[in-house]
Amino acid sequence: RYLVTGHNQGIGSQGFRMGIPEDLGFSNDQFRNRVGKTFGVMELQPGQVNWGVYNPQPLPGAVRMWVYHVFAGGGKFVCNYRFRQPLKGSEQYHYGMIMTDGVTLSPGGEEYVRITQEMKKLRAAYDKKSRMPKQLASRRIGLLFDMNNYWEMEFQRQTDQWRTRPHIHKYYNLLKSFAAPVDVISEKEDFSDYPFLIAPAY
C-alpha cells in the first residue's frame, strides 16, 4: 500500500499526505474474505517514495494510522518497504525505516517503534472471547465485487465518463458512514451469512 504518491488528494488541505481513507478500509474488507484465515500487508510505505506523481512526506502519524487500520480491519501482520534507505541506485530517494547512515530512524521508523510499544500493551488487554456486538452484527453487509468484472468494465467502458472503482466506492463509503460492517465478497460466498447484500455494477 502506497498511499502518499500524488495519485489522490485525500481529504482536506493535507489529505494528499495521508491518502484516501476508504482505500484502506476497502482493501481490508476485500482481502480479509479472499485469502483464507490470515491476511496482512506485504509492503506499507514508511515514508516518501521516489516514483510518485509527486513525493511528499506522509503527515506525522500517518504511518501509525495506516498500521492500525490494517489490524482494525482484521489483518494479522504488516511489513514495510523498505528497512533502510539505500545510498545509491534507482530508489535512492525512497525512504526506509532507517536513514542512509544505517542508524538514524526516519520519521516513519519512529512511528513503527511507537507502534510496537503500543502493541505490547494492547496484546495484554486482548480478550480472545470478545465478539462483534449484536447491534453491529445486525447491520452486516455483503458487497459483491469481482476483479474479473472490474477489469472487463474498465477495459470496455460504454462511455469515457464511467469509472468502476469510484462507482463501487459510492456504495462502500455510504455503508461505512453509518458504521456498517462490510465484507467485500465474491459470488462464491454463502449469501445467507448477510442480512443485506449489495451488488453495484456486478
What is each PLM-predicted segment?
Residues L3-Y202:
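Carbohydrate-binding surfaces of carbohydrate-active enzymes
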